[in-house]
Amino acid sequence: MSDEWMQAWQPTIDVVGRDFSGGLESTAIDTIELGAVRKFLEAVELDCPLHYDAEVAKAHGYRNVLAPISGVSQTWLDAALWRPGLGSRYPSNHPHVDVPRERVTEAPSPPTPPTTVGFATDVEIEYFEPPVVGDRLTVRGRKLVSCTPRETRVGRGAFMVWEREVINQDGARVALIRNGGYSYVPFESSDEASSPRPPRPPAP
């Protein structure tokens, strides 16, 4: 059957909506600091008192100085490359040393057919409780939101979207982060594609 490769993704489709985090969470190494917010503003020259004046922020209904939401996905969630108690991440001065990583329990994976290549496709962030100075954020969950098998110009595979939740120290939801990606088996040649596109004409 020509659609056997699509049917191979049915077990993955069947588990859409399930969490595959294994209960793992990652908490930022630091609380959000006023100095860190200042440096964040400095790079983009953002002059808004909500981000540096606590009285102004509270007068507008916020708990404290607002941290720029663009830092939610990475900066305010930084778990640190090294912490006291860990061994050196650079045990050798060799320029190509394999930097050891902290061992953590591996999260489970959904049932998927074999693929050999993949790439990120999109990132979507939905914001809720604004993060403020003094908050310490945690990211948790790894829910499979969707799985869409599709043949593209590069191969056959599926587009999958994963969702993680960001909360603050009080358990309030700060954001939902959805990451999309395409996992596939590439065509060995363009002749394998069901509907190969003709080559583009040469530029004049």
Task: Enumerate the predicted regions with their spans.
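HotDog/MaoC-like acyl-thioester-processing domains
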Residues: 1-25, 119-204
